[in-house]
Design a protein with these regions (language model features):
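Enzyme catalytic cores with a strong preference for nitrogen-chemistry domains
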Residues: 1-211
Length: 211
């Protein structure tokens, strides 16, 4: 890191299920309100909402989500010292992935897919999403842009020089956490995009996972 301090924000926008336009407006508003930060992290699937269920099979929803990602990226052109990470569903090679999109200086810099897909209790993500495990060194072409796609990606914050890693919700709850490998690879900051429900004692347990 060039600087030893980076101001980070965990943003919690008001969201509507499958209302991409509304969700995008809320994300852009929070970016503008917190533009003095060096890093803003939004929840898992924040562009569409987590609970779209079988609507994740809608090509229209996925198309709108992609368009929204680039609209959000465009708004960051004026905040060139800021990195934003949002959650978005992305189709890659005929599979759908729950991704973290790393955005900075008007560009989508990377797409990092969720590796561990929960299928127990109230979670049944495997109905819609594939695991990103094993996807390394790939790129995806979206809207005329070649974007790095995979689980081996670390991004550098343009202002602080911090090396950023991203994982998504369940990735933190497994024994072989992606964040462990990111740390070994040199990540200074690791973010976890989540849309997890609240249960008694869950917050304390979550803290223990990262202690």
């Amino acid at each position: 890191m060039r600087n030893q301090l980076i101001l980070a924000a965990a943003a919690v926008p008001s969201l509507r299920v499958a209302d991409v336009e509304y969700n995008t407006e809320q994300i852009i508003r929070l970016i503008a309100e917190n533009s003095r930060c060096g890093l803003i992290v939004f929840p898992e699937l924040s562009v569409t909402g987590y609970t779209c269920a079988d609507l994740f099979g809608s090509e229209l929803l996925l198309k709108k989500a992609q368009e929204a990602m680039f609209i959000i990226a465009k708004t960051t052109e004026e905040y060139r010292e800021l990195t934003v990470i949002i959650g978005v569903p992305i189709r890659f090679e005929n599979n759908l992935y729950n991704c973290a999109a790393v955005i900075s200086a008007g560009k989508v810099c990377a797409l990092i897919p969720k590796q561990y897909i929960p299928n127990y209790s109230e979670f049944y993500e495997g109905r819609w999403f594939a695991s990103g495990r094993g996807i390394v060194g790939q790129t995806i072409r979206l809207h005329g842009h070649e974007i790095p796609f995979g689980t081996d990606i670390l991004a550098e914050d343009p202002e602080s020089g911090a090396v950023l890693g991203a994982e998504i919700c369940e990735d933190l709850w497994v024994p072989d956490k992606p964040s462990t490998h990111m740390s070994i690879a040199g990540a200074n900051i690791i973010v976890n995009l989540s849309a997890s429900d609240e249960l008694i004692g869950k917050q304390e347990y979550r803290k223990e996972l990262v202690a």
